[in-house]
Design a protein with these regions (language model features):
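Single conserved hydrophobic/aromatic residue that forms the stacking wall/gate
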Residues: 1-6, 10
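ATP-dependent carboxylate-amine ligase
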Residues: 12, 19, 23-29, 33-41, ...
């Protein structure tokens, strides 16, 4: 009887935990799931404004990933960021002041699947055009947003809005 009562209490507690987890929302702009289109999942990690933060975004991916990076040049080094790709990142799509600098760093580390874009929208479109079902598109730029956006929040909001409006 005691074990039956304990089991019933445990089940009710687990049901509550499951409900809370179902309603849990990630922190906005931090490895935030946005939507899925044609089997491609989109993630907003606009808060990844430096290489160390952006490494965490890459580590969180469990699918082949097309990564949008680049932005304002804060004189960061990108070696560790590129090394963290470790087979997870299949394509690096770059924007902003740092795009050439990051492309050179990627080449130095043997990562050659790099595309340079002139606009943020072009980068998103390029990722979507090159993604296949089962892939992820991750905005985790390793750079500040200045010069292209007011702040990382604006960059993240624009990303989410643009992605949600992509054609199926």
């Amino acid at each position: 009887l005691a074990s039956s009562a304990a089991s019933d209490v445990y089940k009710r507690q687990m049901d509550k935990i499951v409900e809370v987890l179902k309603r849990f929302q990630a922190v906005e702009h931090r490895i935030e799931y946005v939507t899925e289109k044609r089997g491609v999942k989109f993630y907003n990690d606009s808060k990844g404004t430096n290489p160390d933060a952006a490494i965490q975004g890459i580590r969180a991916m469990n699918r082949p990933t097309l990564l949008i990076g680049g932005g304002y040049d804060k004189q960061s080094e990108y070696d560790e960021w590129i090394e963290s790709f470790d087979g997870k990142v299949k394509k690096l799509v770059l924007i902003g002041q740092t795009k050439e600098k990051i492309a050179e760093c990627a080449k130095k580390h043997g990562f050659e699947d790099v595309i340079l874009c002139d606009t943020f929208e072009e980068a998103i479109d390029t990722c979507y055009a090159n993604a296949v079902s089962g892939d992820a598109v991750l905005l985790s730029p390793a750079c500040a947003s200045w010069g292209m956006f007011a702040n990382y929040e604006e960059r993240g909001r624009i990303f989410k809005e643009y992605v949600r409006n992509l054609a199926e």
